[in-house]
Regions:
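Intrinsically disordered, low-complexity regions enriched in serine/threonine
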Residues: 2-182
Length: 182
C-alpha cells in the first residue's frame, strides 16, 4: 500500500515489472495504440502456438533432420558437392564431422562444428527428449543452438538474436520446417 510519493518512487525503482505513463496530451492515443499492439501480439502468439503444435505431429527421420540442418547452414554449391561425393550418407557424415568428407567437399570446420552442435542439441538439448523425431524438434534444435549454445555474449548476442544473423537463420529455419510440414 502506497502512503506517500517517496514510498511509491522507492517501490517503482525496485520493481521489475512495471510501466510508467506520463499524462501528456497524447496519452490517450498512445494507450489506444498500445492496446492495438497487444491485440496483434496476442493474435500472433495464438497463431504461432497452433503452428508449433502442428509441427509436433510431423515426423522427421534423422536423415531428414541432417538434410534440414545442412540445407540451412550450407550454400547450394556446398550441398551439390556433398551430394556428388556421397549421395546416400553425405549429410550424416558431415553432421558427424567426417574430416575426410569435409576436406573433399571443402566445407569449413566452423560450419561442420555448428552442424554438429545443432545435431547434439537436437538429440540431447534441454526439453528435446519429448520432441526428438518431429519437425518441431528439428526447428527447436536450431533456435536452441542460437539461444543457448552459440558463443556470442552480452549485447552482441542480443543484437544477433533480435536483428542479426541468428534471427535471420531462425526465420529461415522456421520457413524450411513449415515447407517440410506442408
Amino acid at each position: 500500500r502506497v502512503i506517500c510519493t517517496n514510498m511509491l518512487n522507492g517501490a517503482l525503482d525496485k520493481a521489475s515489472c512495471h510501466i510508467r505513463l506520463r499524462h501528456t496530451k497524447s496519452i490517450k492515443e498512445k494507450l489506444e495504440l498500445g492496446a492495438q499492439v497487444l491485440k496483434v501480439a496476442c493474435s500472433h502468439a495464438l497463431d504461432a502456438q497452433e503452428l508449433y503444435r502442428h509441427l509436433t505431429t510431423i515426423k522427421m527421420s534423422d536423415e531428414d533432420v541432417y538434410k534440414y540442418l545442412c540445407e540451412l547452414q550450407l550454400t547450394p554449391a556446398e550441398i551439390e558437392r556433398i551430394n556428388q561425393y556421397d549421395p546416400n550418407k553425405g549429410y550424416a557424415r558431415l553432421v558427424a564431422r567426417d574430416y575426410r568428407l569435409l576436406e573433399a567437399v571443402e566445407i569449413s570446420s566452423r560450419k561442420a562444428n555448428q552442424l554438429y552442435n545443432m545435431m547434439d542439441y537436437y538429440n540431447d538439448g534441454i526439453g528435446q527428449k519429448d520432441i526428438c523425431g518431429t519437425a518441431w524438434g528439428a526447428y527447436n534444435a536450431v533456435t536452441g543452438f542460437y539461444c543457448n549454445v552459440a558463443n556470442l555474449e552480452g549485447e552482441k548476442r542480443m543484437n544477433s538474436l533480435v536483428w542479426g544473423s541468428a534471427n535471420n537463420n531462425m526465420n529461415k529455419a522456421l520457413n524450411a520446417v513449415v515447407a517440410y510440414a506442408s
